[in-house]
């Protein structure tokens, strides 16, 4: 998946250059290729913008992006690609599963858990469903949307604040009364802070995009910078490389299943702490070093003290910092995507939305960095 991501990012860069040059057909082709290799919010946003402009007919914005007449061949190619996806083989069981997910009215029904399900119950349910409905494994019509809905359900229910808000508001029907465009809705109401593919990679292996990130080790701060490697080549070379990536993608589900079966043996018992209050772990404590709040059971003090407690609190702080770092990365990525879309389509509303992102996790990450540096 790592090589797919790099190639997908390169396809997005080529597509951006094509947009600026007015070559709409080439831009759409490379954006579609990027989505096949490694789905991303940036490529998806650009493709959706193309679709909106296509439906707008010969309006000013459509003419500005195309800088010329539309090519009927591009639409035929797009339709042919879509029909080929739905034509892949699938079982009746897979189709029935997709229909079940579609009919679910609440996120609890989607994951098949009770309303008082704990963190471990949510994780187990997500692992099982994510593997079953991942688009690389399940080719039934609607499987991709079902996979997105499963990821969105876990992302909301695993976040205490979003879950509390969701429980107060109600089912998915109430969230969608004001926008009946058909299908599943992932961009309004209760939005997940992470894409379904990123969530899947966090569970089953895979990293975050390269860039400037903070890492913490042995109580000290360390700053590392990874640079993107720019590749050059012709379009025909890009197309030939697809064969190797496709083979790797086909083998991924088998590799993931093997890893899950090996790791499941080590994930049976619940951790002795939680970063958020939950059933059985409601007693609040703070770490001695960073003053990070965590929650434990009533008999915690009788089991953890001295060196054992110090080691546990070190793990808690590392867990907290990793959480903040990942959330900061998502905030930066979201702001970057919106700013780029605002620049390309000259949409002031997107720019205002990007600037309104609070970046709370990045502020917290800077605070921790200053703390480790003695600031």
From Swiss-Prot:
InterPro entries: DnaJ_domain (IPR001623), DnaJ_domain_CS (IPR018253), DnaJ_subfamily_B/C (IPR051100), DUF1977_DnaJ-like (IPR015399), J_dom_sf (IPR036869). GO terms for biological process: chaperone cofactor-dependent protein refolding; protein-containing complex assembly. It is a single-pass membrane protein. Residues 48-95 are annotated as: Disordered. Residues 106-170 form the J domain. Pfam families: DnaJ (PF00226), DUF1977 (PF09320). Residues 1-242 are cytoplasmic. It is found in: Endoplasmic reticulum membrane. The keyword Transmembrane applies. Keywords: Chaperone, Endoplasmic reticulum, Membrane, Transmembrane, Transmembrane helix. Its main location: endoplasmic reticulum. The chain crosses the membrane at residues 243-263. Belongs to the DnaJ family. DNAJB12/DNAJB14 subfamily. Acts as a co-chaperone with HSPA8/Hsc70; required to promote protein folding and trafficking, prevent aggregation of client proteins, and promote unfolded proteins to endoplasmic reticulum-associated degradation (ERAD) pathway. Acts by determining hspa8/Hsc70's ATPase and polypeptide-binding activities. Can also act independently of hspa8/Hsc70: together with dnajb12, acts as a chaperone that promotes maturation of potassium channels by stabilizing nascent channel subunits and assembling them into tetramers. This is DnaJ homolog subfamily B member 14.
């Amino acid at each position: 998946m790592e090589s797919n991501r790099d190639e997908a990012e390169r396809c997005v860069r080529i597509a951006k250059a094509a947009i600026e040059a007015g070559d709409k057909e080439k831009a759409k082709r490379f954006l579609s290729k990027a989505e096949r290799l490694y789905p991303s919010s940036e490529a998806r946003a650009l493709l959706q913008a193309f679709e909106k402009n296509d439906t707008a007919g010969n309006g000013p914005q459509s003419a500005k992006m195309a800088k010329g007449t539309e090519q009927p061949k591009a639409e035929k190619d797009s339709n042919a690609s879509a029909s080929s996806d739905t034509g892949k083989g699938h079982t009746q069981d897979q189709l029935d599963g997709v229909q079940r997910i579609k009919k679910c009215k609440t996120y609890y029904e989607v994951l098949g858990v009770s309303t008082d399900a704990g963190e471990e119950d949510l994780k187990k349910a997500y692992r099982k469903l994510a593997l079953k409905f991942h688009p690389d494994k399940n080719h039934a019509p609607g499987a991709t949307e079902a996979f997105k809905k499963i990821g969105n359900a876990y992302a909301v229910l695993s976040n205490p604040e979003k879950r509390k808000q969701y429980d107060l508001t109600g089912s998915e029907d109430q969230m969608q009364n004001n926008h009946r465009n058909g299908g599943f809705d992932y961009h309004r109401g209760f939005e997940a802070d992470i894409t379904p593919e990123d969530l899947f990679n966090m569970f089953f292996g895979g990293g975050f995009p390269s860039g400037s990130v903070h890492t913490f080790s042995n109580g000290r701060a360390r700053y590392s910078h990874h640079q993107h490697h720019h590749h050059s080549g012709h379009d025909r070379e890009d197309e030939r490389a697809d064969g190797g990536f496709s083979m790797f993608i086909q083998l991924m589900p088998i590799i993931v299943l093997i890893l899950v079966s090996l790791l499941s043996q080590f994930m049976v018992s619940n951790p002795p702490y939680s970063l958020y209050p939950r059933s059985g772990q409601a007693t609040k404590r703070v770490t001695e070093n960073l003053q990070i709040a965590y929650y434990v059971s009533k008999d915690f003090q009788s089991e953890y003290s001295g060196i054992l407690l110090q080691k546990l609190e070190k793990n808690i702080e590392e867990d907290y910092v990793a959480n903040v770092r990942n959330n900061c990365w998502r905030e930066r990525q979201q702001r970057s995507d919106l700013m780029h879309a605002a620049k390309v389509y000259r949409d002031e509303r997107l720019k205002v939305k990007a600037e309104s992102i609070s970046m709370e996790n990045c502020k917290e990450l800077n605070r921790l960095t200053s703390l480790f540096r003695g600031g």
